Amino acid sequence: MTIKQLHESDRPREKMIRLGARCLTDAELLAILIGSGNDRQTAIQLAQEILAKMDNSLPRLAKCDIQELTGSFRGMGPAKAVTVMAAMELSRRIPSQEMPRRESITDSRMAYRTISPFLTDLPQEEMWVLLLNQSGKIISMENLSRGGVSETSADVRLIMHKAVSHLASAIILAHNHPSGTVRPSEQDIQLTQRVQKAATLLGFRLNDHLIIGDDGAYFSFADEGLL
C-alpha cells in the first residue's frame, strides 16, 4: 500500500494541513521529510523502521550521518538522507537564535545555551570559540575544528588569530564529547592551559572552556575553579 492509497485523513501531509504539525506523530513527520517509501514499505512504515532502530529517540537520529541512513535502510537514498539531516540541523540551531546575540554572556549557563545547539548530538568532536567584546557581548562564533581535541590542540595560534582579528576582549572555548561524558581529559586540560597562557600574553581573557555532553550536561572550567 502506498500513502496515496490511505484515506486522505490519514495521509501525513493532508493531516498536517488540516490539524497542524503538533497532531502528527514523529513517524508521520519523518515520513513527510522522506517523501516516499520503497517497494515494500510506505514512507510511514519506513519512518517507523528508522525510528525503531534509533530506539524512538530523535537525538539518536540527529547523530546519524548520511552514510548510516543510506546504508541501513532500504529506499533511503542520498536525497532523502540529506533532507532528514537538514531538518535535524535546523532544529538544532533554533535555541541559539532565541537568545539575542547582543546579550552579554555573564555565566556558564548563558554560554552553554548559546553554543550547545551547535555541539549537541554530533557524531564527531568539534571545537568552537565565542569571541566577546569588552561588555561580554558576542562578536562572533567560529568553528575551529572537527575531529577531536588532539587535532585542535595544535591550533592555539588559530584561536589567537581569530581573537585578535575580531578585536575580542575575551573568548570562551567549547567542544563536545560524543561519548556523552563531560569529564575533561588530560588533553582538554592542557589545551585550556595553553590557550589561557597565550591569551594573557596577548592581553585578553579566556573566560571559560565548556565541555558539552548529553542531556543538558556540561563541564565549565571556570565554574570548577580551573581558570
Swiss-Prot record:
Give the record's keywords alphabetically.
Hydrolase, Metal-binding, Metalloprotease, Protease, Zinc
**Domain (MPN) ranges:** 104-227
Recorded hits in InterPro entries, A to Z, give: MPN, RadC_JAB, UPF0758, UPF0758_CS, UPF0758_N
* GO terms under biological process: proteolysis
Matching entries from Pfam families are given as: RadC (PF04002), UPF0758_N (PF20582)
SUPFAM superfamilies to which the protein is assigned, alphabetical: JAB1/MPN domain
- Please tell me which stretches of this chain the record labels as motif JAMM motif: 175-188
Q: Which GO terms describe its molecular function?
A: metal ion binding; metallopeptidase activity
Binding positions for Zn(2+) per the UniProt entry? H175, H177, D188
* NCBIfam families cross-referenced by the UniProt entry: PRK00024.1, radc
Please state which protein family the record places this protein in.
Belongs to the UPF0758 family.
Alphabetized PANTHER family for the sequence = DNA REPAIR PROTEIN RADC, UPF0758 PROTEIN YEES-RELATED
Q: Name it.
A: UPF0758 protein PG_0894
Which organism encodes this protein? Porphyromonas gingivalis (strain ATCC BAA-308 / W83)
The organism's taxonomic lineage, starting at the top? Bacteria, Pseudomonadati, Bacteroidota, Bacteroidia, Bacteroidales
